[in-house]
Amino acid sequence: TIVCAALFMGCDGIEEIELPDTITEIGDSAFKSCKNLNKVIIPESVTKIDGDAFAECSGLVDIKMHEGINTIGSRAFYKCDRLLDIVIPDSVEKIEFEAFRGCDKLENIKLSENLTIVGYGVFGDCKSISKIEIPKSLKKFDGTWGRGTNLSYGAFGGCSNLKTVNFEAGSTIVCAALFMGCDGIEEI
């Protein structure tokens, strides 16, 4: 069962969501712009969170994602600017472009140990992140330039408070502009 595209888009009365384990996919913009949504629990039955699913949910503070999710779609949590922490389950292999871009207060990120692909700008402009640990499973950062917008940087571009970057032993990542605009980096 899929939560259809834009099904609850702009429903400001929704404050908490605990999806049942019959749901397998959260559609594009399903809960986009639900301004008062503050807590989301995603069960292990969900394998994909589509693009913009929770974008611009400005009240979102707490997301619990269980094992089972394989892909987090583009801009899925774009501009969820009250979000402080995110734990990406180890089942996640791919995070598409700008999934968490503009989450201004996001401080702590735990990436999946099985993550292989991260799209451009995934954590772009997350100005509160101070430390990131890159797992050795990660093989590709999509550092795509341009596309007619100002998205001219890699996954962590514009994370101005980023101070420490740790690459897990065995990492073999090469990517253009991965940390472009991260002028606070002190330790690699």
Question: Where are each of the predicted segments found?
Answer:
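Structural signature of tandem-repeat unit edges
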Residues: 1-2, 11-25, 35-48, 58-71, ...
